[in-house]
Amino acid sequence: MASTRLPGKPLADIAGEPMIVHVWRRATEAGVGPVVVACAEPEIAAAISAAGGQAVMTRPDHPSGSDRIFEALESVDRESAHDAVINLQGDLPTIDPAIVRAVLRPLADPGVDIATLVAPITEAKECYDPNVVKAALSL
């Protein structure tokens, strides 16, 4: 919600629904298991609930999304029944559900503990933009 470039971004209206609801729908359409939105803002939880989804409120002071997910897991998966978690950012309203499924494929290898989706940088200016996340790969 505290985006400096677009304050309130998760609730930005896209075709009559908040952005976060579009992301939740894409994740649900992937069919990979339960989808829970971890959030610190009651407005986000209310939007997800109104759409029929499940949201878990977390502390607002987490330094990362991974920390927020860990807190949410402590309440929704107390028995550690799930062996994988997908950390899907709330600002990807058009993500293809097939991409969500694809991130699980590497985890079928017992030697793999984590998988991250990346895409090639297509414009030179993105190389120097601090708002574009980069990944170093060895292929």
Language-model-detected regions and their locations in the chain:
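Conserved core of the sugar-phosphate nucleotidyltransferase
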Residues: I95-L139
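Residue-level signal for alpha-helix termini/capping positions
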Residues: T28, E74-R78, A108
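Short beta-strand/turn micro-motifs composed of small residues
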Residues: M1, C39, Q89, V118-A119
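N-terminal glycine-rich phosphate-binding loop and ensuing alpha1 helix
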Residues: M1-C39
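Short, high-confidence coil segments that cap the C-terminus of an alpha-helix
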Residues: V32, S80-H82, D109-D113
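Residues at the C-termini of beta-strands that transition into short coil/loop
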Residues: A15, R59, V118
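Short phosphate-binding loop-to-helix
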Residues: V36, P42-L88, L92-A102
